[in-house]
Amino acid sequence: MTTGLDAARKQEIKEIVCDILEIDEDEVTETSLFKEQHDADSLRAIEILAALERTQKVTIDQAELSRMVNLEGVYVVVSEAAQN
């Protein structure tokens, strides 16, 4: 899936997600599920959304949380938000 995000931006997003989920970067893949594999709860999902809005200078509707289940989904949502 093409997101239009460069490698540096993807790395920054990955660092944010890993920091909030309190996991090492090598523990997460683009397709590993935050809730099922990394014990993320809804509060952490909101924290991820807020941090992404702040650092990536985008606005993300909370309805997009259902798509932000893994890094791949986060990349797509951020990419789409950046285009708006």
Swiss-Prot record:
Domain Carrier: 7-82
Gene3D superfamilies: ACP-like
Keyword Phosphoprotein: yes
The keyword Cytoplasm appears for this protein: no
PROSITE patterns: CARRIER
Signal peptide: none
The name this protein goes by in its record: Polyketide-8 synthase acyl carrier protein 1
Modified residues (O-(pantetheine 4'-phosphoryl)serine): 42
Keywords on record: Phosphopantetheine, Phosphoprotein
Intrachain S-S bonds: none
Biological role: Acyl carrier protein.
Post-translational modification: 4'-phosphopantetheine is transferred from CoA to a specific serine of the apo-ACP-like protein.
Recorded superkingdom: Bacteria
InterPro entries: ACP-like_sf, PP-bd_ACP
Source species of the chain: Streptomyces avermitilis (strain ATCC 31267 / DSM 46492 / JCM 5070 / NBRC 14893 / NCIMB 12804 / NRRL 8165 / MA-4680)
